[in-house]
Amino acid sequence: MVDGDAEEVARSAEESTEPVKIVQRLGHRGLTIATAESLTAGALAARIADVPGASIALLGGVVAYSNGVKENVLGVDAELLETHGAVDGGVAAQMAQGAALVCRAGLGVSTTGVAGPEPHQGKSVGTVYLGFYVAAGVVQRLGIRMPENCSQDETASVEGALAGYRLLDLDGDREAIRWASVEAALQLVSDVLHTEPTGLPHA
């Protein structure tokens, strides 16, 4: 879990992870990425798309604010949504998987959480789950493993794929929580890529 002041979390992630570096690293490995966003409502995809030439890696994204879109577009399990609500690690992982499958990308990353100002479905303001999914072929080709400070999700329906999530517990206002969620999601993508056994060049 990553916890603390939302603005501090955002700045720390922003300083250590530049979107241009992520796009370059994805491109150098022939990898593509797709996003699924709830509380960030497209801001994560926009952050990646700000990089000139981002189309080499970014295939698309889904803004899944409602449970209906999570279920019907991204394929999130209806029973999971009913039992645990939208703000859940398993939901985040399935959202990431759904984005990757819908967009036919090698990697998927997602955001779901409570930006405020009020709690939601029993989850406190600042509770955020970031999900990720790595296709089986990418796992096999690059040896991608579970990054630190993440939990594996066993509901990935594709054999050999890797799916998981990272929990954030943030203090701050709505804007700061959404900002931190975007930057922390980029950090998560970087962390996933850095599990490649040979490491990544600083390109």
Outline where the language-model segments fall.
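Short alpha-helical segments enriched in small residues
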Residues: 1-203
